[in-house]
Amino acid sequence: MSDLPGIVVTGASGRMGQMLMKTVLASGKARLVGAVERPGSDWVGRDAGAAMGGAAIGVTVTDDPLAAFAQAQAVIDFTAPEATVQFAELAAQARAVHVIGTTGLEPVHLERLAWAAHHAVIVRAGNMSLGVNLLTRLTQKVAEALDEDWDIEVVEAHHRMKVDAPSGTALMLGEAAARGRGVDLAQARVSGRDGITGPRAPGSIGFSAIRGGDIVGEHDVIFAAAGERITLRHVATDRAIFARGALKAALWGQDKRPGQYDMMDVLGL
């Protein structure tokens, strides 16, 4: 077992953090060697397995990420933008693969990730599932095939606790549509229409977000023309799909050169 890659999970106490730890522990392909939480968390100092309500696993939750990363070959990180860029710099120091599922990253954060990627492998994606990445590729292909008479709308739905909108996955799909059309999403994007908006701008790519209940994640890409429409859809019913994809990315990155990669690279799409 000791020759298996060691994985550290950040944001250990969160729903995704716990799912990631359980996925690593059950995989038989990697070892969970660390769990990181913010200073002041009541998880710090506890055994990660016991903190999740199970048996002890011999991994103590820490608030010292660099010490944890130094013992690992990969870090899996679904936290928040400011935390993620700090983790990226520390993972680069430790030369650990950094798998990032954090959404809501702004250009200032991406600049810091680009620096870290000079020294370590970073795999970042708005969504780690195979199905969504296939949907992304299909979205680009359909957008390439259809002209501007077909309007493009991205509609996403998530649980009530999600703090950013549109979702990272929705933006990933929008970027794919924009690439297919040969346009810049920043110029084509229209989000959250309200009030008297006037006619739809030709060539625009619209985004709508729904928040409620415990919806894991639903994404529709709608291509609408006069008299017909095409809807490409993905529904996630279990966030374990994201954890499995993240672990796949962590293992894939072990023999890669420093740089920035995404799930398309991991999946060979």
Curated annotation (Swiss-Prot):
Pathway: Amino-acid biosynthesis; L-lysine biosynthesis via DAP pathway; (S)-tetrahydrodipicolinate from L-aspartate: step 4/4. NADP(+) binds at R38. PROSITE patterns: DAPB. The active site is at H158 (proton donor/acceptor), K162 (proton donor). (S)-2,3,4,5-tetrahydrodipicolinate binds at H159, G168, T169. It comes from the Bacteria. It catalyses: (S)-2,3,4,5-tetrahydrodipicolinate + NAD(+) + H2O = (2S,4S)-4-hydroxy-2,3,4,5-tetrahydrodipicolinate + NADH + H(+); (S)-2,3,4,5-tetrahydrodipicolinate + NADP(+) + H2O = (2S,4S)-4-hydroxy-2,3,4,5-tetrahydrodipicolinate + NADPH + H(+). One of its GO terms (biological process) is diaminopimelate biosynthetic process. Pfam families: DapB_C, DapB_N. It is an enzyme of class 1 (oxidoreductase). Its EC number is 1.17.1.8. GO terms for cellular component: cytosol. One of its GO terms (molecular function) is oxidoreductase activity, acting on CH or CH2 groups, NAD or NADP as acceptor. NAD(+) binds at G11, A12, S13, G14, R15, M16, E37, G101, T102, T103, A125, G126, N127, M128. It is found in: Cytoplasm. Keywords: Amino-acid biosynthesis, Cytoplasm, Diaminopimelate biosynthesis, Lysine biosynthesis, NAD, NADP, Oxidoreductase. InterPro entries: DapB_C, DapB_N, DapB_N_CS, DHDPR_bac, NAD(P)-bd_dom_sf. Belongs to the DapB family. PANTHER family: 4-HYDROXY-TETRAHYDRODIPICOLINATE REDUCTASE 1, CHLOROPLASTIC-RELATED (PTHR20836:SF0), DIHYDRODIPICOLINATE REDUCTASE (PTHR20836). This is 4-hydroxy-tetrahydrodipicolinate reductase. It comes from Cereibacter sphaeroides (strain ATCC 17029 / ATH 2.4.9).
